[in-house]
């Protein structure tokens, strides 16, 4: 009898946890040409001259055409600002994350969360396929010039990315499961209070690339743990 009650209680707990997880899952919709994600309380701005946005299984799918890139070299002589993106403009401190599924299979194809001020002031947290033949994390912070950095390999074809703002500081994080986070880098940007953030996809040397963004989460909050961004 006691064992039966324990099993029943355990099943209830598991069911409740599953329902809670499902309730937290984000849902992207595309209706009458207007894109929305229910966990983002903002009007979404789409820049799709070089790609397309669609919805599949309640996730945002961002398709990049051949030759798309967001890039600045270290002396500012080479600048590219031509990726399909979906952006919104938050205010105050925030914590923003998403799961990225990207079957990255050509060098520099990738999907990113970005912080965008203008053509010369932006930052991206990128899950991309490197020339080494492995998928990993790269970042760039551009302030007229860029500073490409590689942050190691990530196994599989999915990763969680997170962008946090506290006052004028931004912090990038990655996670294999959306629970335990690793801090990648912190930085500042000119006009930090008025930047836009969102999703981007790129295929600078490939024939095109498609990435899926799901489990999108946003809240206006100030992190208490710098190393976790929570």
Residue ranges and their predicted role:
Residues 1-10:
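Bacterial N-terminal signal peptides that target proteins for export
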Residues 10-19:
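Bacterial N-terminal signal peptides
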Residues 20-25:
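Boundary at the C-terminal end of the N-terminal hydrophobic targeting segment
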Residues 26-230:
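Extracellular glycan-recognition regions
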């Amino acid at each position: 009898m006691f064992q039966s009650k324990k099993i029943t209680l355990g099943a209830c707990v598991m069911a409740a946890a599953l329902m809670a997880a499902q309730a937290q899952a984000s849902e992207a919709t595309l209706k009458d040409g207007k894109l929305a994600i229910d966990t983002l309380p903002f009007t979404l701005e789409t820049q799709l001259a070089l790609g397309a946005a669609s919805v599949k299984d309640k996730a945002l799918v961002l398709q990049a055409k051949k030759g798309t890139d967001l890039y600045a070299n270290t002396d500012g002589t080479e600048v590219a600002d031509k990726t399909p993106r979906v952006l919104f403009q938050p205010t105050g401190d925030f914590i923003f994350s998403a799961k990225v599924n990207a079957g990255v299979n050509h060098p520099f194809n990738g999907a990113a969360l970005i912080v965008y001020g203008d053509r010369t002031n932006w930052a991206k947290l990128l899950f991309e396929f490197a020339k080494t033949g492995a998928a990993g994390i790269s970042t760039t912070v551009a302030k007229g010039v860029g500073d490409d950095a590689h942050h190691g390999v990530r196994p599989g074809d999915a990763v969680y990315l997170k962008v946090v703002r506290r006052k004028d500081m931004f912090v990038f994080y990655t996670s294999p499961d959306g629970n335990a986070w690793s801090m990648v880098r912190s930085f500042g940007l000119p006009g930090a209070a008025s930047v836009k953030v969102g999703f981007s996809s790129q295929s600078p040397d490939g024939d095109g690339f498609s990435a899926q963004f799901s489990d999108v989460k946003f809240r206006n909050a100030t992190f208490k743990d710098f190393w976790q961004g929570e």
